[in-house]
A protein has these predicted regions:
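The conserved Walker
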Residues: 9
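Phosphate-binding/switch loop-helix module in NTP-utilizing enzymes
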Residues: 91-130, 162-166, 171
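Intrinsically disordered, low-complexity terminal tails and inter-domain linkers enriched
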Residues: 42-62, 120-164, 193-195
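Hydrophobic positions on the alpha1 helix immediately C-terminal to the Walker A/P-loop
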Residues: 16
Length: 242
């Protein structure tokens, strides 16, 4: 089963997914892939958002503003600075006009080296999937075993589990429109259900949902859309048999 977690920007999808991963681990389901938590700071009183901030998905209300995005690799917990708001990168002289995100006109300045690191992680997960399909012993990269994901998924120490869930947070315009970004995650998803990863959950913004369905349905069949709420938790747990 392929679940698509969707909703508008800044509706708590990643926080919901992190809590779900912790709960599933406690119930015997291993989550492997990537989470994309935001980097935030308190908003100055009366401060307005820039055009770049709004383009990046910021909102004019709220006590915090989003400065960037990290990636947390699951299950090892490695945390990678992944993206910075484009206007902040320009102001710091760190904006790379040749980067994938710049060429795509995104509101985030995404580090191509960070993309490469996440892709390497998914290549290793694909190797695990291949070993499992051939009847070999599948192990997650860098881990001797798997264990329960605590409330902070970045602190995971994992032990063997009977069921695995592939997690991709998130698929955006780079992946779904331009064929760039997390290409190794897309390649793994294109395999459909495998012995190592019979189920997957991807995060996709609502405006990209039709493209995601067209792209992934051939491998997975019907995609099940869920929201970051208790009903979504129940649907995932039911499909996983927990």
């Amino acid at each position: 089963m392929l679940f698509v977690l969707t909703g508008e920007v800044q509706t708590g999808k990643t926080r919901w997914l992190g809590r779900l991963a912790a709960r599933l681990a406690a119930e015997g389901v291993r989550c492997a892939g990537v989470l994309a938590p935001g980097v935030w700071r308190p908003r100055a009183e009366g401060a307005a958002l820039s055009a770049e901030d709004l383009h990046a998905g910021g909102r004019a209300e709220g006590a915090f503003e989003k400065l960037g995005i990290d990636n947390v690799l699951l299950p090892c917990g490695e945390r990678i600075p992944f993206a910075r708001r484009a206007d902040l990168a320009r102001a710091a002289g760190a904006f790379d006009c040749a980067s994938q995100s710049a060429r795509a006109g995104l509101g985030w300045a995404i580090d191509d080296a960070a993309i490469a690191r996440v892709n390497a992680h998914f290549r290793e997960l694909a190797t695990e999937a291949g070993a499992a399909a051939e009847g070999g012993e599948a192990k997650v990269p860098g881990e001797s075993g798997f264990g329960a994901v605590p409330s902070d998924p970045s602190q995971a120490v994992l032990r063997p589990f009977a069921v695995s869930l592939l997690v991709v947070d998130e698929l955006g315009r780079l992946e779904l429109v331009r064929g760039e970004g997390l290409i190794e995650a897309m390649a793994l998803l294109d395999r459909g259900p495998t012995p190592a990863f019979p189920h997957a959950l991807v995060v996709v913004r609502e405006d990209l949902l039709p493209i995601a369905r067209e792209r992934l349905a051939p491998a997975w069949g019907v995609l099940r859309s869920i929201r970051p709420d208790e009903e979504g938790v129940d649907q995932v747990r039911a499909a996983l048999g927990v």
